[in-house]
């Protein structure tokens, strides 16, 4: 956000962590901006303007990597089923009834995968937020990978006073409809998070 812009004049908050700019026509822009984070959306999503469902640009540009990344969704789905079969069955029923198999990663219960990287140079933390577009009845899974040594980068849920320091090659299962964020990372290492989810928007 540029210096000198005034709240509710030049921009307005869409969420506590994102904002919309006023366009030259005097209307609020359709795109919401937020703090920069090294992240990419991978998988299937409905087009913002067309309404059609298609694979993301990243998938089209990286077909070999896409084939390998789909394994993350399979492992996360297995962990989800083992951890909470009741919620898993609700999420699977939603997918079976409302989402065609060709728009699910590996034919499973997830439609998209967000890949985030945290390191001190860029994307060192993520502000508190609620994931928009996630299935209300479901839960989100997160694969966590570590490269090198670092402290911080805890997944936090402020409402519950919880901060999770995820070990390498672990899966976290949580409700992304609750306010959450990632604390500041410290050190030379990097943290990678892959989050398969159902996007319903």
Regions found by a protein language model. Give the residues of each.
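Fe(II)/2-oxoglutarate oxygenase catalytic core
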Residues: 1-141, 164, 186-201
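Conserved short secondary-structure elements within globular domains
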Residues: 116-123, 143, 154, 175-181
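Contiguous, well-ordered alpha-helical segments that form the cores/surfaces of helical PPI scaffolds
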Residues: 137-146, 170-173
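A short beta-strand-loop-beta hairpin characteristic of the jelly-roll/cupin
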Residues: 145-167
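Catalytic or ion-translocation cores adjacent to nucleophile or general acid/base/metal-coordination motifs
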Residues: 158, 177-180, 185, 193
